[in-house]
């Protein structure tokens, strides 16, 4: 069985403190569609991987004068991601400068404006949290819920990387919102920007050794690659010291420079002044559990256990990534491929070596080609492995055999394995608002529950006592929050990015358009006689950057222009 991939061919200033987002009234029906040009085949087995790719990445000239993108200059002149952001946030202007717009990404925020309004731009900021494994404390959830009402647009957005997004925050409120998150067990540091982003792991709170080990490893990797120079706290809480603790193995791995990985005299020992060439994404999981879309990450880490279920080490994949540019076939989505196996005690050193290889060799002249996947595509996996091993100080061991991957959503009621239960609630496109927002707060607050965000934009209520199951089920049902068996299977697995009206990269609808699109797909299924239970995974993005991972969907719709999409078929999430 093979899986085929291929392309089908300014408003008035705000008077109120909240950004008003208009409703969407549907896409115009269109019979026009681009036709496939090149079919790109991918075996479904993880043991014989091919790549999603079109052509080779253009090599950077070694003889020409080294050029750098504008963002590289901004980073160099920023005093470790401080200037001019630290000055811009103090002005009365509703927006920040071009340089500060790039720097604030490292702090976990994007400057946006409502693209459906004409005239002068109504600027606001999207704030994204960083939650390794999707873990969210009770205190942080209630804080985010409050902030959405007080400073946002009244909704919370769950992302495909297990984080919150808070839209519509005005510049004058940024410091208040950021400081509130920091002081309530949260962080936005590194949720965006040219560094390691949120580290994914299965969200299910299963009391199994492999799951617990995967989640702890994800948290350790996140700590290892967190910025160290203090710029985040200097700007948002005036340098206030936030007490945190790190496992000693994380500190040791970060400080180790026995193979030339570090900048020894820098406040950023791993990143230096320039950080990474581009964003960097990592996921950790256990065999069979592909809730994290493991092969779409720059680094994919898989726990390997012995026959008794004891973790022994990790298989590592490298070079995945979804983003591309329309009609530029030197850009492409790509699946990660195996680089090798490492013992469990070496995982932090191996990950650090891969990150440093990208830091030193990734392109910094053209950001379209700056992701790790293009370096590996240009070099080939053998050369890449050889260079990584120099920083790692060891040879990778042969990749261990793995079973086939399965898509896991963890919706509904499940036993954790420690005497407690968890409940996975489906959230259409990750948007928590209205009655759902009110009811979730009521349940989470009443029972003092922690939650987890899944990579499929859903939410899990954790550590539920058996006696609470019935009243929680009743409360959710009375609010119209349906159990999975009552939700259309198309909706259960569908995902869409926010797109219009706030995303600056969107070229058509995604989140606001997907309800109507799914209804039309269901109508087609009914006409051809497909059973209700027979479904496909549908993912929609408003641009080719692939935030909802559409290239891995069985049916992927990728925005190609106003009210038009490329159609990508045959993925296996």
Swiss-Prot record:
Subcellular location: Plastid, Chloroplast stroma, Chloroplast nucleoid; Plastid, Chloroplast stroma; Plastid stroma
Major location category of this protein: plastid
Reaction(s) catalysed (UniProt annotation): hydrogen sulfide + 6 oxidized [2Fe-2S]-[ferredoxin] + 3 H2O = sulfite + 6 reduced [2Fe-2S]-[ferredoxin] + 7 H(+)
GO-annotated cellular components: chloroplast nucleoid; chloroplast stroma
EC number, UniProt record: 1.8.7.1
UniProt KW keywords: 4Fe-4S, Chloroplast, DNA replication, DNA-binding, Heme, Iron, Iron-sulfur, Metal-binding, Oxidoreductase, Phosphoprotein, Plastid, Thioether bond, Transit peptide
Protein name in UniProt: Sulfite reductase [ferredoxin], chloroplastic
Organism (species): Glycine max
Lineage: Eukaryota, Viridiplantae, Streptophyta, Embryophyta, Tracheophyta
């Amino acid at each position: 069985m093979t899986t085929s991939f291929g392309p089908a061919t300014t408003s008035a200033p705000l008077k109120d403190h909240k950004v008003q987002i208009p409703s969407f009234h549907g896409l115009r029906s269109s019979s026009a569609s681009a036709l496939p040009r090149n079919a790109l085949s991918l075996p479904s087995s993880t043991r014989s991987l091919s790549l999603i790719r079109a052509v080779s990445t253009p090599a950077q000239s070694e003889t020409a004068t080294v050029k750098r993108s504008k963002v590289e200059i901004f980073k160099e002149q920023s005093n470790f991601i401080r200037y001019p952001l630290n000055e811009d946030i103090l002005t009365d202007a509703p927006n920040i400068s071009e340089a500060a717009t790039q720097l604030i990404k490292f702090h976990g925020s994007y400057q946006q404006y409502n693209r459906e309004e004409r005239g002068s731009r109504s600027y606001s900021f999207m704030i994204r949290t960083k939650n390794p494994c999707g873990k969210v404390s009770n205190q942080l959830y209630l804080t985010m819920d409050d902030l959405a009402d007080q400073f946002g647009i009244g909704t919370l957005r769950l992302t495909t990387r297990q984080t919150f997004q808070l839209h519509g925050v005005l510049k004058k409120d940024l410091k208040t919102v950021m400081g509130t998150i920091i002081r309530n067990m949260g962080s936005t540091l590194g949720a965006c920007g040219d560094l390691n982003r949120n580290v994914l792991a299965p969200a299910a709170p299963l009391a199994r050794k492999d799951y617990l080990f995967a989640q702890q490893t994800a948290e350790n990797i996140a700590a290892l690659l967190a910025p160290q120079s203090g710029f985040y706290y200097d700007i948002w809480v005036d340098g206030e010291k936030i007490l945190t603790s790190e496992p000693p193995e994380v500190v040791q791995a970060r400080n180790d420079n026995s193979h030339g990985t570090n900048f020894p005299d820098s406040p950023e020992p791993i990143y230096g002044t320039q950080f990474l060439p581009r964003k960097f994404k990592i996921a950790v999981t256990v065999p069979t559990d592909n809730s994290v879309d493991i092969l779409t990450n720059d680094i994919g880490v898989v726990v390997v256990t012995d026959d008794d279920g004891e973790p022994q080490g990790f298989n590592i994949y490298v070079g995945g990534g979804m983003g591309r540019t329309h009609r530029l076939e030197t850009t492409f989505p790509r699946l990660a491929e195996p680089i090798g196996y490492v013992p469990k005690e070496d995982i932090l050193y191996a990950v650090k070596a891969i990150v440093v290889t990208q830091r030193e060799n990734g392109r910094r002249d053209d950001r379209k080609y700056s992701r790790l996947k293009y370096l590996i595509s240009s070099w080939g996996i053998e050369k890449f492995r050889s260079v990584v091993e120099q920083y790692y100080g060891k040879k990778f061991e042969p990749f261990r055999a793995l079973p086939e991957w399965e898509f896991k959503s963890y919706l509904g009621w499940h036993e954790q394995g420690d005497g407690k239960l968890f409940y996975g609630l489906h959230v259409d496109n990750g948007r928590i608002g209205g009655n759902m927002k009110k009811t979730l707060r009521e349940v989470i607050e009443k029972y003092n529950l922690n939650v987890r965000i899944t990579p499929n934009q859903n939410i899990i209520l954790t550590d539920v006592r058996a006696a609470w199951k019935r009243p929680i089920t009743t409360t959710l049902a009375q609010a119209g929050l349906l159990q999975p068996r009552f939700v259309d299977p198309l909706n259960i697995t569908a995902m869409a990015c926010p797109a219009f009206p706030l995303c600056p990269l969107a070229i058509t609808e995604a989140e606001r358009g997907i309800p109507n699109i799914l209804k039309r797909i269901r109508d087609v299924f009914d006409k051809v006689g497909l059973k209700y239970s027979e479904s496909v995974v549908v993912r929609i993005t408003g641009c080719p950057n692939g935030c909802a991972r559409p290239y891995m969907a069985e049916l992927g719709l990728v925005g190609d222009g106003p009210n038009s999409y490329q159609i990508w078929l045959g993925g296996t999430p």
